Amino acid sequence: MANPTHSQVVAAPDSSGRLLRLVSASSVMMQLLGKSTNIRMSQILEHHEDEDFSAHRTKIVCTMGPSCWDVDKMVQLIDAGMNVCRLNFSHGDHEAHGRVVKNLQEALKQRPGKRVALLLDTKGPEIRTGMLEGDKPIELHAGDMLKIVTDYSFVGNKSCIACSYEKLPSSVKPGNTILIADGSLSVEVVECGKDYVMTRVMNPAIIGNKKNMNLPGVKVDLPVIGEKDKNDILNFGIPMGCNFIAASFVQSADDVRYIRSILGTKGRNIKIIPKIENVEGLLNFDEILQEADGIMIARGDLGMEIPPEKVFLAQKMMISKCNVAGKPVITATQMLESMTKNPRPTRAEAADVANAVLDGTDCVMLSGETANGSFPVQAVTVMSRVCFEAEGCIDYQQVFRATCQATMTPIDTQEAVARAAVETAQSINASLILALTETGRTARLIAKYRPMQPILALSASEETIKQLQVIRGVTTFLVPTFQGTDQLIRNALSAAKELQLVSEGDSIVAVHGIKEEVAGWSNLLKVLVVE
C-alpha cells in the first residue's frame, strides 16, 4: 500500500477499535515540508558565542520548582528567555505557590522592562495507585497476577494494590491495557469485579507509592475540574492574578465551557488553555479548539494513550489547526529531559525543539528541566538558542501564503487589516510591525500570519500585555493611555530604537483603530519612516 500523502487522512486504531483520525489536510507547515526552509551552509558552520539569542520569537514556558524558584534564579531565567511561569498544582499548596509568585514579582522589579505571564496548571482528573506496605517499592514479574482494588485506603503489596478511581471496574473490560508509573508497568485486564479489577503483569517492573495510571482508549468518568481544582482556581488563580488556566485532561468543548462558568465574572478575562492528553481530547479537538483560548499539547500522557510513533502526527495536526485558527499552542513534555541531570541536551532533544518551532508552535515548555533539574538556567538558554536558529531558516513568505490559503473566507475587517499589514511589511521590507491593541486581538491576528518582522504590541492593559507573552513573534510595550495615537507611535518608535528593533531610516507598518476610544477594532494601516 502506498504511503499516505499530507492531504490524506492518517488513521490509527485505538484500543476501543475506533479510528483516531489525524487529519492533516489543513496543515500549514506540513504543506510546506521541504519548501519552507532556506538553509545556507554558512548558517550551519558559523557559530557566534556573543549572538543575542534573546530575540527568539518562540516563547518559553518554565515550570517552577525547588531548582529555580528563588529570586536570583528567576532573574537568571528571565535573562535566559523565560516568558511564562508555570505553576504545577499537581504538586505544592497555595502557600508554596504564593511564595513563587511573590519571588517572581521581586525578580521582575530587577528587570522592569520585562513581562512574565502566570499559568496555573490544574491537577485534573488524575488516577493514581495507593500506598504500599512499609512505604517500600514492590517488584513484579511478567505473568504475575495483580489485583487492583478501588478502596483507596487499602495498603498494597505485590499481589494487590489500591487505585483512586472508583469506577475502574465499570470503565475497563477484559483485554484492556492499564499503564502504571509513566508506562513502566503494563498490565492486562482479565476480570472485572464489583470493586476490583484482576490483571496480568505484562513486563517486569518495580513501582513505588502513588504512581500515575493511564487507561489507553478508555473514557474516564471523572470531572475535568474536581473540588481541589475549583479551590485552586477560585482561591489562588483569580486573586493572585494568573493569566492562564491550563486545564488537564480536557475531553470536550463542554469541559471548556464548564471551566469558564467556574471562573465567573471575577475570572472572565483569564484565558483557558486545554491540555490535550488523551484519545477523547484528540477526537474532539476541533470543538475544543473553537471554545478554547489556546491549546497545550501534553505529549507525556498523550504518548500513553496513542502509539508513540503517532505522537508526532498528532503534534503536527494540532499545531497546524491552532495556527490557522490564530490561537496560541504550547508544545510540552520531555523537550530537554536529559538536562535535568546533564548540562547539554541530547542531539535528538535539540532537534525536537527545532522541529516544534518549524511545525509552527507558539511556545515550548520546560517541566522537570527547570522545576527539579540541576541546570535550569542552561536549559532555558539552550532552548532560546535552538528556537532562534530554527526561526532563522523559515521561509516566511511561503508560510504567509499557506496561511492565507488555509484561512476560510470571508474574514472580518480586523483580520483583513492584519493580513494586509504583514503583506505590506514584506513588500516594503519593513523592519517592524507596530500594533496598538487594547484586547490583544490585533497583535494575535498579525502574529497568525507569521511575518518575518518582529511585532511590537502597545497596550494600556497590563493584563493584555501578560496574555501576549504566549504569542509567537510579539514583543510588548505598556503605555499609559491610548489617547493621542500619533504621540504614542512616536514614543513606541523611540522605545523600539532603544530595543534595537529599528534604526533611523527604517520603514515600519503601524496598525490601529480610527476611533481611539473603541477597543477591539483596528481598521487603519500606516507606513512610517523612523526618524
UniProtKB/Swiss-Prot annotation:
Transmembrane segments: none annotated. The keyword DNA-binding does not apply. Keywords: ATP-binding, Glycolysis, Kinase, Magnesium, Metal-binding, Nucleotide-binding, Potassium, Pyruvate, Transferase. Pfam families: PK, PK_C. It catalyses: pyruvate + ATP = phosphoenolpyruvate + ADP + H(+). GO terms for molecular function: ATP binding; kinase activity; magnesium ion binding; potassium ion binding; pyruvate kinase activity. ATP binds at N88, F89, S90, H91, R128, K211. Mg(2+) binds at E277, D301. PROSITE patterns: PYRUVATE_KINASE (PS00110). The keyword NAD does not apply. Substrate binds at R86, G300, D301, T333. The record marks K275 as: Transition state stabilizer. Disulfide bonds: none annotated. Gene3D superfamilies: Phosphoenolpyruvate-binding domains, PK beta-barrel domain-like, Pyruvate kinase, C-terminal domain. InterPro entries: Pyr_Knase, Pyrv/PenolPyrv_kinase-like_dom, Pyrv_kinase-like_dom_sf, Pyrv_Knase-like_insert_dom_sf, Pyrv_Knase_AS, Pyrv_Knase_brl, Pyrv_Knase_C, Pyrv_Knase_C_sf. Its cofactor is Mg(2+); K(+). It is an enzyme of class 2 (transferase). It comes from the Eukaryota. Belongs to the pyruvate kinase family. Homotetramer. PANTHER family: PYRUVATE KINASE (PTHR11817). This is Pyruvate kinase. It comes from Eimeria tenella. The gene is PYK.
